[in-house]
Amino acid sequence: MNLIDGKALAAKMQAELKVKVDKLKEADNVPGLAVILVGEDPASQIYVRNKARQATAIGLNSSVVRLPETVSEQELLDLIEQYNQSEQWHGILVQLPLPEHISEEKVLLAIDPEKDVDGFHPMNMGRLWSGNPLMIPSTPAGIMEMFREYDVELSGKRAVVIGRSNIVGKPMAQLLMMADATVTIAHSKTENLRELTKEADVLVVAIGRDRMIKAEDVKEGAVVIDVGMNRDEDGKLHGDVDFDEVKDVASLITPVPGGVGPMTITMLMEQTVRAASRKMNENK
């Protein structure tokens, strides 16, 4: 078993991003990331704080707007439009989930696709599925960086993705197909799941079930990517994969924490920097 160290890879990428940001600043082009948080959800506050901290660390111009849970949908849409129109901001991120009275679909549609660093706008989803991506959801994008860093051969390999969300499962499957893997998407209703997972050269698990994947579910020598984040009764964090069991079967495996999580935030920063570079080239 070899560990895929997401924390170390994220730190390496952050150092490279800082160099790129410094070069953009020399050309009077400071990449800007605007983050909007609605309400007081504790987990969302932690995520936003981590994003803002990393943005500052690599030299981005970062703005965090905290809105009360009572903010109207129209007020939020108006704020997004202000960021859309401003050349100061190259990335816009609205932290999910949103209060029930605000339509998540309307909010995601309101963000300029070229500033949609989360990659959730339908136009960006469509571009990804057409094989011509602009912005890619950050967790799958981070996983692909892991594959590159650790020289994981994907072409012709059998990949199984457990989970079919728009945030991880579906875009992950498409990125694997673009890398010429043969991909199966499984989910909570899939029958005989073990028959699929035992055949997988690459297994990506993003289903939100604490340690559901055991050693007997995994092919010897498989690459296992664990996207899950589940807390047990003692508050300890676990993935969707039983790490202690599966590490003895897998050739490569991500831990939880310290695997996929650090890469997710780093890819948000990377897409913001790329958006700023793209805008600068357009203005030449």
From Swiss-Prot:
Domain of life where this protein originates: Bacteria
GO cellular component: cytosol
Pfam families to which the protein is assigned, alphabetical: THF_DHG_CYH, THF_DHG_CYH_C
SUPFAM superfamilies assigned: Aminoacid dehydrogenase-like, N-terminal domain, NAD(P)-binding Rossmann-fold domains
Molecular function (Gene Ontology), one example: methenyltetrahydrofolate cyclohydrolase activity
Transmembrane segments: none
NCBIfam families named in the record: PRK10792.1, PRK14179.1, PRK14186.1
Quaternary structure and partners: Homodimer.
Function (record text): Catalyzes the oxidation of 5,10-methylenetetrahydrofolate to 5,10-methenyltetrahydrofolate and then the hydrolysis of 5,10-methenyltetrahydrofolate to 10-formyltetrahydrofolate.
Annotated protein name in UniProt: Bifunctional protein FolD
Organism: Lactococcus lactis subsp. lactis (strain IL1403) (Streptococcus lactis)
